[in-house]
């Protein structure tokens, strides 16, 4: 029986539980572990392994595969250490899904935008800067701009700059002038990641891709009065049938970032239809076509399961079963 680890941080998380159940159903022996308690021993004694990787009582190097649901937040050195462990396990022959490189590619919004654009995929116009002057120029040039933390998640700490004001994702207007707020953000982050705001019908799309194939999608609709569509920010989910063009760019986005499974966030543009019907992606040159917003390398499967009854965990474990 193949031994697989499932790295989680919240035992009650829907996706974590779904992965554990699917692993058992596929005949795997799942080891549930938390990378935040992982330890590594390095020795030059011939009587001991050169390197010993443990998480609690689990010997990580004995695993056939490791599925990463969550690495866990924390200080820079701690998070970097966990990714080092994943890289070293991978080098030692453990199949890691998603790979540490892919998770980091997806988590870094700036680098993900670069990879997506390099692959010829449509993305919002984007500027990354390290000065307030450059940030003001970018925001002014876009007219309506969004500033996101490069390593943000769940729609937190997103700011929209429009008409001389900054509104944050909690819908409050930022205190101080735009310049003062940008100075504060730059001091905190060291750089600013700025995108044009894409006018849209009050929703975006989360497509789930496994093994290079889009298995389903949902609309994420913003809460009343909000401009942020994340479910974690009060948004709601509904069924979405992807147009062929949207399916194609979602699958290519997962490949461009290096993910085996991923949540691909797509924004449609203001002219999109507002039903659940198949939509056509408009010509990229019009500025109103579908664009890739982000790639999530550790996505939740709950939204698509609630909307469609599609369980991404089953697809992930089936893919893993086929490659081991």
Curated annotation (Swiss-Prot):
Top-rank lineage group of the source organism: Archaea
GO molecular function term, any single one: GTP binding
Xref: PROSITE patterns: ATP_GRASP
Enzyme class: ligase
Residues annotated for Mn(2+) 1 binding in this entry: 265, 294
Keywords: ATP-binding, GTP-binding, Ligase, Magnesium, Manganese, Metal-binding, Nucleotide-binding
Binding-site list for Mg(2+) 2: 294, 296
Pfam families named in the record: RimK (PF08443), Rimk_N (PF18030)
UniProt EC number: 6.3.2.33
Protein name: Tetrahydromethanopterin:alpha-L-glutamate ligase
Organism of this sequence: Methanosarcina acetivorans (strain ATCC 35395 / DSM 2834 / JCM 12185 / C2A)
């Amino acid at each position: 029986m193949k031994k697989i680890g499932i790295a989680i941080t919240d035992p009650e998380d829907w996706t974590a539980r779904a992965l554990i159940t699917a692993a058992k159903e596929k005949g795997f022996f799942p080891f549930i572990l938390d990378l935040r308690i992982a330890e590594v021993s390095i020795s030059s004694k011939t009587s001991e392994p050169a390197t010993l990787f443990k998480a609690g009582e689990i010997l990580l190097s004995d695993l056939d595969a490791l599925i990463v649901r969550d690495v866990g937040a924390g200080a820079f050195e701690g998070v970097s250490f966990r990714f080092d462990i994943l890289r070293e396990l991978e080098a030692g022959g453990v199949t890691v899904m998603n790979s540490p490189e892919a998770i980091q590619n997806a988590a870094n919004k700036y680098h993900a935008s670069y990879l997506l654009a390099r692959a010829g995929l449509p993305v919002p116009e984007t500027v990354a800067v390290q000065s307030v002057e450059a940030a003001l120029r970018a925001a002014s040039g876009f007219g309506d701009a969004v500033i996101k933390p490069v390593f943000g998640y769940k729609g937190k700490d997103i700011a929209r700059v429009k008409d001389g004001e900054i509104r944050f994702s909690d819908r409050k207007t930022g205190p101080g002038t735009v310049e003062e707020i940008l100075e504060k953000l730059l001091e905190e982050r060291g750089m600013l990641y700025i995108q044009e705001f894409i006018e849209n019908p009050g929703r975006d799309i989360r497509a789930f891709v496994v093994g290079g194939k889009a298995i389903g999608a949902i609309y994420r609709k913003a809460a009343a009065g909000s401009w942020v569509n994340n479910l974690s920010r009060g948004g709601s989910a509904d069924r979405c049938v992807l147009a062929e063009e949207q399916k194609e760019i979602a699958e290519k986005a997962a490949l461009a970032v290096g993910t085996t499974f991923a949540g691909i966030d797509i924004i449609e543009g203001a002219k999109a239809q507002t039903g659940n019907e198949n939509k056509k992606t408009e010509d990229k040159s019009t500025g109103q076509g579908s664009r890739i917003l982000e790639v999530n390398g550790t996505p939740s499967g709950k939204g698509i399961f609630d909307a469609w009854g599609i369980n991404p965990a089953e697809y992930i474990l089936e893919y893993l079963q086929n490659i081991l």
